[in-house]
Swiss-Prot record:
One of its GO terms (cellular component) is nucleus. Keywords: Coiled coil. InterPro entries: Tex35. It comes from Bos taurus. The keyword Coiled coil applies. Residues 47-111 form a coiled coil. This is Testis-expressed protein 35.
């Protein structure tokens, strides 16, 4: 308030109270319209509210556009997420199938290893049996008899001890005596002996000196 109080004048005590109060009358008080000040604002220029309103409208429109863009992005993300979920499910099924196939292969390998091991054991056993069978034969080929003499010397000694039979050429064949007589001419001819008719007299089937 710009009104100033008037300093009281010095009066004598003889004056009455009413006269003193009239002298001390204050100046009239000025009043302001606060409603108008609230609407216009104490520090705003004329026409400033319209600019603010326009700016607010622009900001709201931009916010709406951004919200729509965000909504579209969200829809795309939801679709992509659904696709990702489907892809994950497919991958899980494929992994499950691969695990089952791997189990089957492992079982097949385990089952195939046992026959192979059995076959190897059988081969080793057969080799050992063959070695045990061939060793005595090799020893017999190398040594003969209790004295341990070589087999070749033993054969020579036996050949010397056995008497020679003059009819040995006739017994070279395993068939009958007649066939042996038929075989002898060629052998005798090769050895420089008599021809076939010289031996014909020994044949029981011969009716004459020659056939």
């Amino acid at each position: 308030m710009s009104a100033k109080r008037v300093e009281p004048k010095k009066t004598s005590l003889s004056k009455n109270y009413r006269a003193v109060c009239l002298e001390l009358k204050p100046e009239p008080i000025k009043t302001y319209d606060y409603k108008g000040a609230k609407q216009e604002g104490p520090f705003t220029k004329p026409g400033g509210t319209k600019e603010l309103k326009n700016e607010l409208r622009e900001v709201r429109e931009e916010m709406k556009e951004k919200m729509e863009e965000i909504k579209q992005i969200k829809d795309v993300m939801d679709k992509d997420f659904d696709k990702l979920q489907e892809f994950v499910e497919i991958m899980k099924e494929m992994q499950k199938d691969m695990d089952e196939k791997m189990d089957v292969l492992i079982n097949i390998q385990k089952n195939s290893k046992f026959p192979l091991r059995r076959g190897l054991k059988m081969q080793q056993e057969l080799r050992l049996i063959g070695k045990t069978d061939t060793e005595p034969q090799l020893r017999l080929r190398k040594m003969d008899g209790a004295g341990g003499a070589p087999l070749s010397l033993h054969k020579k000694m036996v050949e010397r001890q056995q008497p020679k039979d003059p009819m040995d050429p006739l017994h070279q064949c395993d068939s009958c005596f007649e066939k042996c007589l038929l075989c002898t001419p060629q052998n005798n001819y090769d050895r420089g002996k008599l021809p076939y008719h010289a031996w014909a007299s020994f044949s029981p089937l011969a009716s004459g000196p020659a056939f």
